[in-house]
């Protein structure tokens, strides 16, 4: 219901655009930057662009990306639409966090489902807390991923940085989801971090082999994180999200959103939202758990 109410508000706000001459015919191609293979963004991005192409008659493409990087490519015009997170979008627009300059060409188009920060480590590891990662080989995601930026904040709340981990004998591998799984299965990495839909296919795979456990974020660390990044919220990994969990895992989260370049005509933006809303059940067939979380 929350998702439906939000979309109705978005559509009502945009309805006045029909009083102006339509510029949709001038748009010949729309490019979306989504996420890496193995996550929910890439397949959903492809499905969304297929819907837009069919309903609006505009040629489309979908390419890989990350929450931070997508704000930059949409701002520059290299992509017309992109996947990100609400707090990342705010930071990009206002030159906060990972953004060295204001990205004023981006606009929020629509909110989707929650993104949950998750940390897993091998089941047979001697790790018991985030503090134990101080000298380990960890995989926080690629540079440009929002998950990588959140991983830095979480580690900072526990008195660590990527550099301090490397100086203590650990290592950082900036790779995508599939390579992250391979590194842990091969015994090279000791922790995998990502902000994704929950459950996530990479973690389901790792939970099958080699088997994983989850690290939670305590209340004291969460308060430090909120001071560093007010846009993050308190959330948890539900006990029924993964096989073997005995209790919810406290963590931090955000909200997935779609951004759009300000130069995309308003009536095109309106028709994109309208088309996606009309095909919501089709999107559920691509990533049922993620899209249902938006309802």
What are these regions (language model features)?
Residues 27, 57, 66-69, 76, ...:
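Extracytoplasmic
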Residues 18-25:
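Sec/Tat signal peptide C-region and signal peptidase I cleavage site
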Residues 9-17:
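Bacterial N-terminal signal peptides
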Residues 79-113, 197-202:
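Acidic, polar ligand-binding/catalytic clefts
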Residues 27-61, 115-186:
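Bilobed "Venus flytrap"/periplasmic-binding protein-like clamshell domains
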Residues 1-9:
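Bacterial N-terminal signal peptides that target proteins for export
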Residues 86-88, 96-98, 125, 161-265:
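Pocket-lining segment of extracytoplasmic ligand-binding domains
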Residues 243-295:
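Segments of small-molecule ligand-sensing domains
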């Amino acid at each position: 219901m929350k998702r439906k109410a939000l979309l109705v508000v978005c559509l009502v706000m945009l309805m006045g655009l029909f009083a102006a001459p339509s510029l949709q015919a001038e748009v010949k191609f729309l490019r979306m930057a989504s996420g890496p293979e193995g996550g929910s963004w890439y397949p959903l991005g492809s499905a969304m662009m297929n819907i837009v192409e069919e309903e609006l008659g505009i040629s489309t493409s979908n390419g890989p990306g990350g929450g931070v990087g997508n704000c930059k490519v949409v701002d520059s015009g290299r992509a017309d639409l992109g996947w990100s997170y609400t707090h990342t979008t705010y930071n990009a627009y206002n030159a906060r966090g990972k953004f060295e300059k204001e990205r004023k060409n981006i606009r929020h188009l629509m909110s989707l489902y929650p993104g949950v920060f998750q940390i897993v480590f091998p089941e047979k590891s001697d790790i018991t807390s985030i503090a134990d990662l101080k000298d380990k080989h960890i995989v926080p995601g690629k540079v440009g991923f929002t998950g990588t930026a959140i991983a830095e904040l979480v580690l900072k709340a526990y008195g660590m940085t990527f550099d301090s981990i490397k100086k203590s004998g650990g290592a950082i591998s900036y790779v995508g989801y599939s390579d992250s799984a391979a590194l842990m299965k091969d015994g090279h990495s000791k922790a995998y971090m990502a902000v994704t839909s929950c459950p996530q296919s990479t973690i389901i795979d790792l939970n099958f082999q080699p088997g994983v456990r989850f690290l939670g974020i305590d209340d004291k660390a969460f308060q430090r994180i909120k001071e560093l990044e007010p846009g993050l919220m308190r959330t948890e990994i539900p006990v029924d999200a993964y096989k073997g969990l005995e209790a919810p895992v406290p963590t931090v989260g955000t909200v997935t959103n779609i951004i759009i370049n300000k130069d995309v005509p308003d009536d095109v933006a309106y028709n994109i939202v309208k088309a996606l809303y009309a095909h919501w059940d089709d999107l559920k067939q691509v990533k049922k758990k993620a899209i249902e979380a938006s309802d």
